[in-house]
């Protein structure tokens, strides 16, 4: 049985990955901050560790590849890393991979105000996972995209920009959705579905 370390210090992100990727025995409502030994995908056991990694600028693919390679060296084994971006179509996909810094600097209200002068409120949520088997190994990329629009903040604001993103075909923001619903349509789900298929094929 091989072990893959999901590298994150974000408890909310970890819970979603548990709910989507790990075994059906895992309760997605669990408040645990670490994965149990029952979390298996095919021949792999998924564990988790928080690792301080240098942040680089570039496309989301470049950022993910760098993060996976750096994490594999620290862990000295197979790792799974994730990078998420939110792109406003009116801004040619900005903030993109820099969304975390936008949230920290101008907040959710500031992000909504960026689009005040634009009719086009459409946006895309992009999740990119990188899997690396170990130091100096090739990084495999798995990406999921969910289209939607930017709206005034609705719902809990404790998970990034979830409260201002309303996916197409729904009247609720990510933050307002039941977790099971969100985890069946989100950009993270779509990317992890590809990760799962890959791991099961190994």
From Swiss-Prot:
Residues annotated as binding Mg(2+): 55
SUPFAM superfamilies the UniProt entry points to: ITPase-like
Coiled-coil region(s): none
Keyword Cytoplasm: yes
Reaction equations catalysed: ITP + H2O = IMP + diphosphate + H(+); dITP + H2O = dIMP + diphosphate + H(+); XTP + H2O = XMP + diphosphate + H(+)
Cellular-component GO terms for this entry: cytoplasm; nucleus
Gene3D superfamilies to which the protein is assigned, alphabetical: 3.90.950.10
Listed cofactors: Mg(2+); Mn(2+)
Record note on cofactor: Binds 1 divalent metal cation per subunit; can use either Mg(2+) or Mn(2+).
Keywords: Cytoplasm, Hydrolase, Magnesium, Manganese, Metal-binding, Nucleotide metabolism, Nucleotide-binding, Nucleus
Pfam families xref list: Ham1p_like
Swiss-Prot/TrEMBL GO biological process terms: deoxyribonucleoside triphosphate catabolic process; nucleoside triphosphate catabolic process; nucleotide metabolic process
Protein EC: 3.6.1.66
GO molecular function, one term: ITP diphosphatase activity
Record CDD domains: HAM1
Localisation per UniProt entry: Cytoplasm; Nucleus
Binding site for ITP: 8-13, 67, 83-84, 100, 159-162, 182, 187-188
Description of how the protein assembles with itself and partners: Homodimer.
Described function: Pyrophosphatase that hydrolyzes non-canonical purine nucleotides such as inosine triphosphate (ITP), deoxyinosine triphosphate (dITP) or xanthosine 5'-triphosphate (XTP) to their respective monophosphate derivatives. The enzyme does not distinguish between the deoxy- and ribose forms. Probably excludes non-canonical purines from RNA and DNA precursor pools, thus preventing their incorporation into RNA and DNA and avoiding chromosomal lesions.
Entry's family note: Belongs to the HAM1 NTPase family.
UniProt protein name: Inosine triphosphate pyrophosphatase
